[in-house]
């Protein structure tokens, strides 16, 4: 085999209080095709020219896996068919890292486990919250122990509906991290630990009220929302519907989770009239299948 296409789901990280720990795979995808060539060299298509060099994340993780296998990097053509918007808090970077790692592994006979691929990509990304659900699918919680990620899947009630509100502007993760404090109070740490536990149980039980209350956070959202125009107006509107609400990852995408149908229609009636930017509403569901060959 000298050609493979990997499909990776979008992911939403944090889910409110689960900062750098919780993640969930969603029904939006990026496909990346890797084709080895006889000639040494790199050709990347399907993305902006600025991402066609050797620092492309899919190529970087592809090379990292080959290096871990003590395999030379041959010539390769990479085509990216991305439907996950860039710098919107939906795991676009993680999708490329996962695709590159899995693509290289498949082309070398699947010699590394999924955990091995997660170890390599986590060393590149720095946190496993998006990577874990991209690899494993579903709802995950992760920690880093002695430098290595440890991930578990959690059950999800089948009745949840997700609605992503995606703005017409981006927010680089580096900027979203730069506004966070270096230290937090003990009270805020306890607040997030307790609320995070409630989020996981609420998602399992299908308890919308518990989820709505549990998704409150004191570690990152209050700082990041200042970077997102319309945040407080949209949050207030969503609260009137009874849906749970949080930042998707570092933002700027906002995520609504509900068990009641018709949320998109309810928001559509008022969203444009209260916001300065254009917000795309994208209904999604949980994707229980992680990255795989197509």
Regions found by a protein language model. Name each.
Residues 35, 134-136, 140-145, 256-259, ...:
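Short beta-strand-to-turn element immediately C-terminal to the catalytic PLP-Schiff-base lysine
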Residues 28, 38, 138, 166-171, ...:
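Glycine-rich beta-alpha junction loops
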Residues 67, 72-150:
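Gly/Ser-rich oxyanion-binding loop with an adjacent helix/lid
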Residues 12-14, 23-26, 70-72, 89, ...:
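Solvent-exposed alpha-helices and their adjacent loops that cap or buttress functional pockets
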Residues 164-225:
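Active-site rim beta-loop-alpha module in soluble metabolic enzymes
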Residues 1-88, 102, 106, 110-112, ...:
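ATP-binding N-lobe of GHMP and related small-molecule kinases
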Residues 203-294:
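Glycine-rich, charge-dense phosphate/pyrophosphate-binding loop(s)
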